[in-house]
């Protein structure tokens, strides 16, 4: 039985991804490409989303960089870099991914399910990058730009430096100095992957107690994720 489309909708109504595609604002012509974008490497399948993630990282860096360049013409390179860093990160892409409930559609291993893998920023942000790569391959850069603009509008009440960027490490250090008279420390737990696609796992300690662990494409990104988690635990970030 063939998939059916409703008369007034471009989305296949009995497709398992119809709701996702509607939230995204794009219907994939090749559902296998969509499947691949949603498949994490933990599934041990021949096709997973790692290659698409690689492409999506480059596409999103360009799209978001251009968007910020045109929107914030009064900002210098330093401010633009801070804005971009807050969006082009595991935390930033996870925020956009959750707007479309991407976590509900991921294909992950049973062990990742047990460890709450659907909520891990490293997994969710990678899937988001892969998904955008899929859109780019089928529909081009303009469609990705339109989707990202829409998701940013839905994810953030205001898109500016004050509301979008926060240096979580600085905020955490100020808080721990005020509350505990100490500063947090960071330790590298693991480093893996080839030079062009590294992944770092960092741990954050306060008074010799581990408060958070996180992964990122750089030590700085992983440390920011750790700081964000610690701030949440300390009720500083809601």
UniProtKB/Swiss-Prot annotation:
The active site is at 57, 129. SUPFAM superfamilies: dsRNA-binding domain-like (SSF54768), RNase III domain-like (SSF69065). Its cofactor is Mg(2+). Keywords: Cytoplasm, Endonuclease, Hydrolase, Magnesium, Metal-binding, mRNA processing, Nuclease, RNA-binding, rRNA processing, rRNA-binding, tRNA processing. GO terms for cellular component: cytoplasm. GO terms for biological process: mRNA processing; regulation of gene expression; rRNA processing; tRNA processing. InterPro entries: dsRBD_dom (IPR014720), RNase_III (IPR011907), RNase_III_dom (IPR000999), RNase_III_sf (IPR036389). Its main location: cytoplasm. Transmembrane segments: none annotated. Mg(2+) binds at residues 53, 126, 129. Residues 167-236 form the DRBM domain. GO terms for molecular function: double-stranded RNA binding; metal ion binding; ribonuclease III activity; rRNA binding. Residues 17-140 form the RNase III domain. PROSITE patterns: DS_RBD (PS50137), RNASE_3_1 (PS00517), RNASE_3_2 (PS50142). The keyword Nuclease applies. It is found in: Cytoplasm. It catalyses: Endonucleolytic cleavage to 5'-phosphomonoester. Its EC number is 3.1.26.3. It holds the Pfam family Ribonucleas_3_3. Belongs to the ribonuclease III family. Digests double-stranded RNA. Involved in the processing of primary rRNA transcript to yield the immediate precursors to the large and small rRNAs (23S and 16S). Processes some mRNAs, and tRNAs when they are encoded in the rRNA operon. Processes pre-crRNA and tracrRNA of type II CRISPR loci if present in the organism. Homodimer. This is Ribonuclease 3. The lineage of its organism: Bacteria, Pseudomonadati, Campylobacterota, Epsilonproteobacteria, Campylobacterales. The gene is rnc.
């Amino acid at each position: 039985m063939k998939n059916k489309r409703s008369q007034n909708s471009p989305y296949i109504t009995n497709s398992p991804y119809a709701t996702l595609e509607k939230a995204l604002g794009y219907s994939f012509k090749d559902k296998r490409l969509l499947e691949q974008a949603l498949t994490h490497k933990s599934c041990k399948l021949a096709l997973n989303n790692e290659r698409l993630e690689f492409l999506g990282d480059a596409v999103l860096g360009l799209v978001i960089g251009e968007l910020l360049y045109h929107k914030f013409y009064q900002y210098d390179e330093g401010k633009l870099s801070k804005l971009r860093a807050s969006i082009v990160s595991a935390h930033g892409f996870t925020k956009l991914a959750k707007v479309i409930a991407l976590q509900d559609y991921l294909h992950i291993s049973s062990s990742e399910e047990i460890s709450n893998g659907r909520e891990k920023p490293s997994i969710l942000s990678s899937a988001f990058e892969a998904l955008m790569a899929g859109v780019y391959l089928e529909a081009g850069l303009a469609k990705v730009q339109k989707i990202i603009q829409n998701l940013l509008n839905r994810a953030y009440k205001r898109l500016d430096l004050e509301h979008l960027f926060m240096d979580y490490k600085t905020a955490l250090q100020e808080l721990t100095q005020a509350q505990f008279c100490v500063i947090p420390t960071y330790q590298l737990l693991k480093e893996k992957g080839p030079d062009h696609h590294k992944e770092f796992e960092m741990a954050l300690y306060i008074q010799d107690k581990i408060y958070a662990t996180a992964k990122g494409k750089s030590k700085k990104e992983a440390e920011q994720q750790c700081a964000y988690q610690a701030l949440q635990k300390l009720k500083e970030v809601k």
